[in-house]
Amino acid sequence: MKETRARQYFLRIPDGHANPLPRPSDAVTDRAFRELVEDANRNGDCIINVGRGYYRPRPEDAVDEKELKEYLAKELSRARKIQTKRLAMKIAFEKRRDVEVFTNHTREA
């Protein structure tokens, strides 16, 4: 039922920034809707939300192009932060492994 509502909501996403579609007020529908947007963007669509709601930016519109660049910059920043965190966690884990191997080795002696 919620997926159907999310799908209906998804189908209303407009072209251009003039009348963006706000997020659904229902949390479950909102989650399903955002998953649909994510899947669509992964599969060749271009849907953005820079705060006022969702829309498909139009190439001939300067505002849309500016907001797309803003959106893509934020996505790149998020991706870099995730990569940095991932690397830090991996290094921390390997350090713990080294300490445990050293500690276990010295305890056995």
Residue spans for each PLM region:
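Exposed, interaction-prone assembly regions rather than primary DNA-binding/catalytic cores
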Residues: K85-A109
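Short, amphipathic alpha-helical interaction segments positioned at domain boundaries
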Residues: A62-L87
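Short alpha-helical segments that sit at the start of domains
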Residues: M1-L11
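Short amphipathic alpha-helical interaction segments
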Residues: V28-R42
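Minor-groove-contacting beta-hairpin "wing" of winged helix-turn-helix DNA-binding domains
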Residues: R52-P59
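A short, conserved structural fragment
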Residues: N41-R52
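Short acidic, hydrophobic short linear motifs in intrinsically disordered regions
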Residues: G16-A27
